[in-house]
Amino acid sequence: MGQIIDGEKLAKEIQERVTTEVAELAKIDKKPGLAVVLVGDNQASRTYVRNKQKRTEEAGMKSVLIELPETVSEEKLLEVVEELNTDDTIHGILVQLPLPKHISEEKVIDTISYDKDVDGFHPVNVGNLFIGKDSFVPCTPAGIIELIKSTGTQIEGKRAVVIGRSNIVGKPVAQLLLNENATVTIAHSRTKNLPEVAKEADILVVATGLAKFVKKEYIKPGAIVIDVGMDRDENNKLCGDVDFDDVIEEAGFITPVPGGVGPMTITMLLANTLKAAKRIWKMN
């Protein structure tokens, strides 16, 4: 029977460390600032942004929300980003995705100053991650590595399989595992004999977007299973990409949904914002 990795508890511990450091900086009149740009009225995005704001303020950081209508021009949005790039009170900039179809996400990400790119999506930060240089790492992959390490497992020398190859989770988490000296396979919808490939993993990260996709025949006994999914099952109940009840019998450690990877994402955003501020102040 697998042990549950408590993402809520770990996220709280990391947030407490960030909050303590922010309080120390306040004593020398320094305050990290995070700006979030929200375009349109997507309810899921709005809820997520509200959570980010609340957690930013709880950590003692400056929190700025800029709301723009769905019809805003790409040019206007890029102007807003450029203004934030030159604002000395803002150290992290995040444009909430997805954006309306008439706006190029790529152009927006490229416009964010890479030293304020706390989402870790700018090509410079992506490149630095892939050559093993210190960079801003996308928040979910960064959180996943912390979750794996919290089990006391040494990643070096382990066999890791990542199911999913998105630029936001799959590819960066695979690279982070490689940087930790794991032997990494990236699997996806075209991978042949997927259960057999997955079953070789000491560490299995699942980011398919398919509810309860991974069953126990995918699991090597004792493996660490990280479920990145946020889906709904046939009863409209929140679930992950892993069939938790089926897999927990085989896994050594497993993240639940909710309460696993999710809470870590915003916490790592705060850690990235603190890191950005310290870099800009040349305090690293």
Curated annotation (Swiss-Prot):
Entry-linked SUPFAM superfamilies: Aminoacid dehydrogenase-like, N-terminal domain (SSF53223), NAD(P)-binding Rossmann-fold domains (SSF51735)
Organism: Listeria welshimeri serovar 6b (strain ATCC 35897 / DSM 20650 / CCUG 15529 / CIP 8149 / NCTC 11857 / SLCC 5334 / V8)
Region forming the signal peptide: none
Name of the protein in its database record: Bifunctional protein FolD
GO molecular function: methenyltetrahydrofolate cyclohydrolase activity; methylenetetrahydrofolate dehydrogenase (NADP+) activity
InterPro entries attached to this UniProt entry: Aminoacid_DH-like_N_sf (IPR046346), NAD(P)-bd_dom_sf (IPR036291), THF_DH/CycHdrlase (IPR000672), THF_DH/CycHdrlase_cat_dom (IPR020630), THF_DH/CycHdrlase_CS (IPR020867), THF_DH/CycHdrlase_NAD-bd_dom (IPR020631)
Lineage summary: Bacteria, Bacillati, Bacillota, Bacilli, Bacillales
HAMAP family according to UniProt: THF_DHG_CYH
GO BP annotation list: L-histidine biosynthetic process; methionine biosynthetic process; purine nucleotide biosynthetic process; tetrahydrofolate interconversion
Keywords attached to this entry: Amino-acid biosynthesis, Histidine biosynthesis, Hydrolase, Methionine biosynthesis, Multifunctional enzyme, NADP, One-carbon metabolism, Oxidoreductase, Purine biosynthesis
